[in-house]
Amino acid sequence: MVWILNLIIVLLIAFMSAYLIRHYIFTLTALYYRGGQPRFIPNGSYQPTVSILIPAHNEEKVIGRILQRTIELTYPRKKLEIIVIDDASMDQTGEIAESFARKCERIKVVHRMKGEGGKGKSIVLNEGLKHARGEIVFCFDADYYPQRDIIEKLTAYFVDPKVGAVQGRVTVLNEPNTMVTRLVTLERIGGYRIDQLARDDLRLIPQFGGT
């Protein structure tokens, strides 16, 4: 029994050491990152149809803010649709989303029933994809507050047929409020300014978040 415990300890130490070395290499790579020349400079001329998926479960405190923001987006209205997937929310999320849908024809609300909800974000997004008609699909979390021109900024890169996915940079709105928000901000900085830069410079597979 003792040897099993010792083996577990050795494996944990080996794993943590390898992980530490990995972070050390990534940090050094990011520090000396120079970046390659862009294959093209997006000019915003490419404007495909876009579907924005917003999965939401008990998000009554923030769903109105994100929907109001999508209405304010500067992307051509006729090429944009917003699909809210209400994942069997027990609060007023669905009702708030429906109130926005009545005011803006670009907003659609898909309701998942009580027995269907709570099975994971991927299932909710797949449900939304069934209703999406856009050439490009975006995913925003319900607590996001995107820049007004975010759609044209990101879709511009898809003019290159070799581009299959694009990810924006997420920042924390209420960074100075609590220790938790400060730690999340630090994690985001490390992810974008170190991890992603190192992956690019080392020609590794990029990491795309779930939103």
Please give the residue ranges for each predicted region.
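N-terminal membrane-anchoring/stem segments of glycan-assembly enzymes
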Residues: 1-46
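Short, well-formed alpha-helical segments that are part of the catalytic scaffolds
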Residues: 26, 32, 36-38, 59-72
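Catalytic cores of nucleotide-enabled group-transfer and carboxylate-activating enzymes in metabolic
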Residues: 33, 73-75, 147, 165
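Cell-envelope/extracellular polymer assembly enzymes that use nucleotide-activated donors
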Residues: 48-51, 81
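Acidic donor-binding segment of Leloir-type glycosyltransferases
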Residues: 67-115
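Long helical/loop segments within the catalytic core of UDP-sugar-dependent glycosyltransferases
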Residues: 101, 105-130, 134, 148-149, ...
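Short aromatic/hydrophobic "clamp" motif used to bind/position activated sugar donors
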Residues: 137
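The conserved acidic donor/metal-binding loop of glycosyltransferases
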Residues: 141-145
